[in-house]
């Protein structure tokens, strides 16, 4: 498998897991950051792997590169300077490779966060398909026969509501679970 095909495969099958893990570690208010740094890591893989070779565990490499990029960006953000120690404390959770059950728990928590009842159903669906399933904005728009700009706006508004309502990626309580599963 050539590098381009491998990176495409990793994007389709691992990017949601990495986004979920980073969102758990850095908090749901940094969902945009998690998505951006995963894309940065995939780009770095495309740039480096053809020359340096594919690492033994490509998904772990992507996670580490994305985590390090997120830390770099957060450290340089003046408004988050007070959070630097908190972020450093979260690092041990990523130090050892997560088991597949941890990754599944993170993905489920991400899906349940995307399906928070504070978000309109259209936002929940678009955000889940984009963030947890890895579909592009264009793919989501085609599936729902909706203009791509509409889907893009739903995603922006959904992420803004998550940030503004301080919605966390933790699993919901037993009372809140049915409302999210219905979504």
Predicted segments, located by residue:
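Hydrophobic/aromatic residues within well-ordered alpha-helical segments
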Residues: 11-14, 66
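Arg/Lys-rich amphipathic alpha helix in sigma70-family domain 2
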Residues: 67-85, 164
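Short, charged helix-capping/linker segments at alpha-helix termini
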Residues: 1-9, 19-38, 48-56, 148-149, ...
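Structural recognition of an alpha-helix C-terminal capping motif at a helix-to-coil junction
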Residues: 36-43, 56-68
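DNA major-groove recognition helix of helix-turn-helix
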Residues: 38, 49, 66, 74, ...
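Amphipathic helix-loop-helix modules that constitute alpha-helical solenoid scaffolds
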Residues: 85-139, 146-183
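C-terminal flanking helix
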Residues: 19, 26, 42, 159-166
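Hydrophobic-face residues of short alpha-helical interaction/recognition segments
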Residues: 18, 22, 62, 66-74
């Amino acid at each position: 498998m050539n590098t381009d095909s491998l990176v495409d495969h990793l994007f389709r099958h691992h990017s949601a897991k990495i986004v979920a893990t980073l969102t758990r570690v850095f908090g749901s208010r940094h969902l945009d950051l998690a998505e951006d740094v995963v894309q940065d890591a995939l780009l770095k893989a495309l740039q480096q792997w053809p020359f340096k070779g594919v690492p033994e565990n490509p998904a772990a490499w992507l996670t580490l590169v994305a985590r390090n990029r997120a830390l770099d960006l957060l450290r340089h953000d003046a408004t988050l300077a007070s959070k630097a120690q908190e972020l450093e404390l979260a690092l041990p959770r990523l130090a050892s490779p997560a088991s597949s059950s941890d990754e599944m728990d993170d993905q489920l928590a991400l899906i349940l966060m995307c399906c928070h009842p504070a978000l309109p159903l259209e936002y929940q669906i678009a955000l889940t398909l984009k963030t947890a399933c890895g579909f592009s904005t264009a793919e989501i728009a085609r599936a729902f026969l909706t203009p791509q700009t509409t889907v893009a706006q739903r995603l922006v508004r959904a992420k803004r509501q998550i940030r503004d309502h301080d919605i966390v990626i933790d699993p919901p309580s037993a009372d809140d679970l049915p409302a999210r599963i219905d979504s």
